[in-house]
């Protein structure tokens, strides 16, 4: 239904498709005015319409009878565009056949269809070992008997000011390194 006509170098053809009731299209060619008097290129415009075209001019560009409107280029330009598209397709193939990444992100859906939980799983062929040393959980209490037995206290030897700090629950987290209990004593520190 579209009329294609390109004449001369740099010629522009215009395709106009109009809505209709299935009537046979009427084709009309009109020469567009040149931009300057010295312009050597000739431009032709092809209009395909259903039904009546005004006698003295063209159908208005913003007529509600228009369905779509596009610009056609010189066939040489189209060949260059197709060659560029082929190059892009070849580049896409090269990128597609590259080596797969070491890590992949996978989704594992568990549960019924109305209650779905999503877990992110890292699919890494190597075992991932992460050992981070965490600080010991310190437990500060007044262990006056333990502090007095150490005999390392200096200064104020009153039992209410003697504090022993030891690590609390060294095996609480299985990922943490196993730490021996710390027994530290401080003297002269007032209790809060």
Curated annotation (Swiss-Prot):
Protein keywords: Plasmid
Region of interest (Disordered), ranges: 17-73
Biased composition (Low complexity): 30-41
Superkingdom: Bacteria
Protein's name according to its UniProt entry: Uncharacterized protein y4dX
């Amino acid at each position: 239904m579209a009329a294609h006509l390109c004449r001369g170098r740099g010629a522009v053809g215009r395709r106009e498709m109009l809505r209709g009731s299935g009537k046979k299209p009427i084709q009309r060619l009109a020469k567009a005015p040149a931009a300057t008097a010295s312009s050597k290129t000739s431009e032709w415009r092809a209009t395909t319409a259903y039904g009546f075209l005004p006698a003295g001019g063209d159908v208005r560009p913003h007529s509600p009878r228009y369905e779509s409107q596009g610009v056609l280029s010189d066939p040489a330009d189209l060949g260059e565009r197709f060659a560029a598209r082929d190059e892009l397709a070849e580049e896409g193939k090269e990128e597609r056949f590259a080596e797969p990444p070491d890590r992949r992100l996978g989704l594992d859906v568990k549960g019924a269809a109305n209650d779905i939980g999503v877990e992110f799983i890292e699919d890494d062929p190597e075992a991932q070992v992460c050992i981070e040393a965490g600080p010991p959980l310190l437990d500060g209490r007044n262990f006056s008997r333990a502090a007095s037995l150490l005999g390392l206290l200096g200064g104020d030897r009153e039992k209410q000011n003697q504090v022993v700090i030891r690590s609390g629950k060294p095996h609480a987290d299985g990922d943490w390194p196993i730490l021996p209990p710390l027994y530290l004593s401080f003297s002269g520190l007032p209790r809060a």
